[in-house]
Amino acid sequence: MEQEQDTPWIQSTEHTNIQKRESGQQTQRLEHPSLTRLMDPYPRTMNRADTHKQIVSWRQWLSLKNPTQGSLKTRVSKRWKLFSKQEWTN
């Protein structure tokens, strides 16, 4: 079997394949999550926490691969907004 790079879409596909194997359905290896969603006859519902984790891991991976001034500004401004919201609610 070939060595694969440790990339987010392969990780998420691997996770999907493991879930399908456990439920006894036929597995199909796909390289990208959007293809998995299109081809899967029983789409999984993701809760908000799972979706957020997936988005965060993608952003971290992308920023590690190609950090730009814009991505740093976005990260800082989002953290500031979250912090200021917490201040208002407390």
Curated annotation (Swiss-Prot):
Keywords: Apoptosis, Host cytoplasm, Host membrane, Host mitochondrion, Host mitochondrion inner membrane, Host nucleus, Host-virus interaction, Inhibition of host innate immune response by virus, Inhibition of host MAVS by virus, Inhibition of host RLR pathway by virus, Membrane, Modulation of host cell apoptosis by virus, Viral immunoevasion. Residues 17-34 have a biased composition (Basic and acidic residues). It is found in: Host mitochondrion inner membrane; Host nucleus; Host cytoplasm, Host cytosol. Pfam families: PB1-F2. The record marks N66 as: Low pathogenicity. Residues 1-45 are annotated as: Disordered. HAMAP family: INFV_PB1F2 (MF_04064). Oligomer. Interacts with human SLC25A6/ANT3 and VDAC1. Interacts with host MAVS. This is Protein PB1-F2. It comes from Influenza A virus (strain A/Duck/Hokkaido/8/1980 H3N8).
